[in-house]
Each structure stands twice: as C-alpha cells, then as structure tokens.
Amino acid sequence: MVGALEALISQGHGGERVAKRQRSATLLDLDILDCPICCEGLTCPIFQCENGHLACSSCCPKLRNKCPACPMENILESILVTCPNDMFGCTESFLYGKKSTHEEECIFSLCSCPSLDCEYSGRYEDLYDHYKLTHISNSYWTTNCFRSSIPYKAPMLISDKIQITRVYEKKILFAVQCFRESCGVYVTVSCIAPSAPEVGQFSYQISYTVDEHTMVYRSPQMKRVRKVSFETPQENFMLIPHNLLRSELLDIKLSIVETSNQE
C-alpha cells in the first residue's frame, strides 16, 4: 500500500486552514518496480531516457549511459514488410507491427470453404465460384438466391446446422447457422469475407413465426468471418425457445441489406 499525506495549508489573512484527506493506492503488479534490464528492484537514483525507458543505477554505467531499447524501437519503426497475401496479388507494404491489422482488412485474405469435408481456401470471390461449382446443384443455387433488402423465406432443418445463401448483387457467400442447446435453438448469420472496405457492410433481420406469433431479430452489422465457426455463438444471435418449436424445420425469413451504400 502506497500512501501520501498532503500537508495542511493556510489561505487568506484569517488563517483559514484546509485539510486534504489522506489518499491511498494499491499497486497490483510489483514487477513494474523492477529494472527492465537486470530485473532487480529499482532503487534511487533511477535513470530514464527521453523516450521514457528506465535503467537502474547499476545498469546505466554498464550501458555507457545509452538506452538499449531506443535502437531496437528505431529498427522496428524502419522495417517495411510485404503482405503475406502478396502471392495472391496484394501489393501493400506496412510497418512490422501493423501486420495483424492489415491482414484482417486485406481484400486478398483467404477464406475457408464452409463445407465440413472441404479444405479449400481462396479469395472470397473465388470461394463463391468454388462453392457454386463443387458443393451444390443448379436448382439449389437458383433457389437460395435473393435480392438485397427484400425478405425471403429461408427454411432449414435444425439438423443441417448450416445453410449457404447469396444475394444477386454480390459474389459473397452468407452462412445461416442454427445450434440446438438446452435452452433452445440459436440462429445466426455471417458473411464469409474479410473485413475489407471493398466487401461492404451488411445488416440483417431474421423473423420466425409460430401460431401467428412472430419473433424478430435485427442486427445493425453482420459479422464478417474468413472461416465459419461451428461453436454456439456468444453474441449476435436469435434464440428460439424449445416451446416455440413445432418440428425439425425452422421456417424463418431473412433479409440482408448492404448498409455501406446507404446515404
């Protein structure tokens, strides 16, 4: 426990005395009081470079008063690396530490096929063509296609767990998934594509009607994923209780809207 008691002060000619309360704070990690070089506890005097890096009184003379951290930071700040997707056409270069941020938004990032027994991965538009040619019939492809912002019927068996659909305006696959749990059936929708501006952003609405009662779930922003997860979602889902299920068939309606093009 670190404590600090501020002294009493006097104000004005009347000698008014103002006492400030004692304040205390708790240090949760004592390791921050160790020298980052030798890992021994810091003691006075403590040496600090102009960039804020610390060294204890024993280490500073050994380093000839030169900060060991600053040169490495300068090196990292001067390293430009190419995108891992350069073999697929990306020409972007970025600072070493920005790699993960760029990969999430790179239009050339690979997306995995949502079919469980398929190991194909490719650009989201190539994945669209692959899925069309490899995994479905022409009749299914025609049936499970709709226009953006227009609600359409998307019935699916709970045991199927996943249904792939698309919109006329985009070469993008959308995954409608359901998960049976003890409290009911979770239904969620995701866009199989990277988080690139070129892909666009989508909102969606799911509705489920039973005995003339309708449940509606609206999401202002659909999640974009490069690989579909088959684990029960923790957020962004509609939950249909078991007492509202009448069969294995989920008779739902779905509407997807591209929000990035709206004024």
From Swiss-Prot:
Positions of RING-type zinc fingers: 35-71
Residues reported to bind Zn(2+) 2: 113, 118, 130, 135
Example of a GO MF term: zinc ion binding
Record-level GO BP terms: protein ubiquitination
EC top class, as a word: transferase
Gene3D superfamilies noted in UniProt: Zinc/RING finger domain, C3HC4 (zinc finger) (3.30.40.10)
Pfam annotation, one family: Sina_ZnF
PROSITE patterns assigned: ZF_SIAH (PS51081)
UniProt function note: E3 ubiquitin-protein ligase that mediates ubiquitination and subsequent proteasomal degradation of target proteins. E3 ubiquitin ligases accept ubiquitin from an E2 ubiquitin-conjugating enzyme in the form of a thioester and then directly transfers the ubiquitin to targeted substrates. It probably triggers the ubiquitin-mediated degradation of different substrates.
Protein name per UniProt: E3 ubiquitin-protein ligase SINA-like 8
Organism: Arabidopsis thaliana
